[in-house]
């Protein structure tokens, strides 16, 4: 059965750790904003019917992004957290669809990783992730408590891919219980689901700090595959 697939891009964050004068999704790499690089990945994919972008209601920058005028893109206003922004986006998406949630500040996603995720047959959804390679320490303040077994640890990436109606229900349940939702998979986990891990590429980085910009620009320069 063919699935109806909608992408959601939460883009209402302020990116305070970037120490920049504007939200990080509007910083430029190769003469395009980070948001434009991200949107182009999904606009180019034939299986994605629509993209819903959640922006801050007071955001003065998004009207200047010409790509947001695409007929495939719908703008909604975000909420107080990333999870609330995603939930607001889900309100304009049909329950019988599947939703693909991706960070606005991950412009280096490869088409091959996106295809691999979309081909997953996990009925409760799946996420891109990378196995932990570094030694992982459990801390108490700035002191090491012990070393974690990294063999079962993964770094969660995006996109994250779920049946829309299940993700809506999971977010509502998490909000009602005042749980901290750091990504969509965590909301699904709180509701008892076990989304599948799909091994992705480590160059699908999230631009968070100033030093990430040069690395992202390098990856984009090398990335001839969308």
UniProtKB/Swiss-Prot annotation:
InterPro entries: IspD, IspD/TarI, IspD/TarI_cytidylyltransf_bact, ISPD_synthase_CS, Nucleotide-diphossugar_trans. One of its GO terms (biological process) is isopentenyl diphosphate biosynthetic process, methylerythritol 4-phosphate pathway. It comes from the Bacteria. The record marks 150, 206 as: Positions MEP for the nucleophilic attack. Its EC number is 2.7.7.60. It catalyses: 2-C-methyl-D-erythritol 4-phosphate + CTP + H(+) = 4-CDP-2-C-methyl-D-erythritol + diphosphate. Keywords: Isoprene biosynthesis, Nucleotidyltransferase, Transferase. HAMAP family: IspD (MF_00108). PANTHER family: 2-C-METHYL-D-ERYTHRITOL 4-PHOSPHATE CYTIDYLYLTRANSFERASE, CHLOROPLASTIC (PTHR32125:SF4). Catalyzes the formation of 4-diphosphocytidyl-2-C-methyl-D-erythritol from CTP and 2-C-methyl-D-erythritol 4-phosphate (MEP). Belongs to the IspD/TarI cytidylyltransferase family. IspD subfamily. This is 2-C-methyl-D-erythritol 4-phosphate cytidylyltransferase. It comes from Actinobacillus pleuropneumoniae serotype 7 (strain AP76). The gene is ispD.
């Amino acid at each position: 059965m063919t699935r109806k697939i909608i992408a959601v891009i939460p883009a209402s964050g302020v990116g305070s750790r970037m120490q920049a004068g504007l939200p990080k999704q509007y910083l430029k790499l190769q003469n395009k904003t980070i948001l434009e690089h991200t949107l182009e990945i999904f606009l180019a994919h034939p299986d994605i019917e629509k993209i819903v972008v959640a922006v801050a209601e007071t955001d003065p920058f998004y009207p200047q992004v010409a790509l947001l005028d695409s007929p495939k893109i719908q703008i909604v206003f975000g909420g107080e957290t990333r999870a609330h922004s995603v939930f607001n986006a889900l309100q304009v998406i049909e329950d019988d669809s599947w939703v693909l949630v991706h960070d606005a500040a991950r412009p280096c996603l490869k088409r091959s990783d996106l295809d691999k995720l979309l081909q997953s047959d996990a009925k409760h959804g799946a996420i891109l992730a990378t196995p932990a390679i570094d030694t992982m320490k459990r801390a108490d303040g700035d002191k090491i408590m012990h070393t974690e077994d990294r063999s079962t640890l993964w770094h969660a990436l995006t996109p994250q891919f779920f049946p829309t109606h299940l993700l809506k229900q999971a977010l509502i349940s998490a909000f009602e219980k005042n749980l901290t939702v750091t990504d969509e998979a965590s909301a699904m986990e709180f509701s008892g689901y076990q989304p599948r891990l799909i091994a992705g590429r480590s160059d699908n980085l999230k631009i968070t700090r100033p030093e990430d910009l040069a690395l992202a620009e390098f990856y984009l320069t090398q990335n001839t595959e969308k």
